[in-house]
Design a protein with these regions (language model features):
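Short, well-ordered, mixed-charge alpha-helical segments that flank or form enzyme active sites
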Residues: 13, 80-83, 107-111, 156
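Glycine-rich phosphate/pyrophosphate-binding loops
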Residues: 95-114
Length: 210
């Protein structure tokens, strides 16, 4: 199988959108392909609608890939979003692929204490919103579970994991834990994050030495 990792950001004061994409082989997590795609930002920043600003470059990064991934991990949110449509959900809808949001910070919701051991998690819950389906499951407080606050490494702040598209919460957590190495981030988003932070404006495609 193939797992993709994606990191989207802005450059030139927001004028340029940059999407960094890595494609890894599962289960070895060997890097097969990587792409950095830049294009002019088409939409102004609107709170709650950031994914609409990010999606054109994100989709553009997938075009040169020689193979289609089976799963995508995105640095950002899935349904752990006020409109239940973070960038991971949005991208999954466009590509019709399973996606997982792996956020370094919380966008919305509440959570209790996160256990200290690696792989442990606590639910991220939010009040019910009109975007939630009619048959959404509610906890004993009448709240919706929108993600997991995951201890990905002992002694480090947790990650905010949420299903994006075609993915359950348990499945999302399981995949992230299986892709953890020695650092806080799972390998797909760690490598995408590293690729995104490389200096220089050269668009790269293909396999590069790690």
């Amino acid at each position: 199988g193939l797992i993709a990792g994606m990191d989207i950001g802005f450059e030139d004061g927001g004028e340029t959108t940059r999407a960094a994409l890595v494609l890894l082989e599962w289960p070895s997590l060997t890097l097969i392909e990587q792409v950095v795609h830049r294009e002019p930002t088409r939409m102004p920043y609107v709170p709650g609608l950031l994914s609409f600003r990010e999606i054109p470059a994100a989709l553009g990064a997938f075009e040169p890939l020689s193979q289609r991934p089976d799963l995508i991990m995105v640095d950002g949110q899935g349904i752990a979003h006020p409109r239940r449509l973070g960038i991971a959900s949005h991208l999954g809808l466009w590509l019709d692929l399973p996606t997982i949001g792996v956020g370094k910070s919380r966008l919305c919701g509440q959570f209790g204490d996160v256990p200290l051991e690696k792989g442990a998690w606590t639910p991220l819950t939010d009040r019910r919103r009109e975007e939630d389906p009619n048959d959404v499951a509610l906890d004993e407080r009448g709240r919706v579970t929108i993600g997991a606050v995951l201890r990905s490494r002992e002694g480090v702040k947790p990650l905010f994991v949420s299903p994006g598209h075609r993915m359950s919460l348990d499945g999302a957590v399981d995949w992230v834990v299986r892709c953890l190495g020695k650092t806080k981030l799972p390998e797909p988003t760690r490598l995408a994050d590293r690729l995104a932070s490389r200096r220089g404006s050269v668009a790269t495609t293909g396999q590069l030495p790690l």
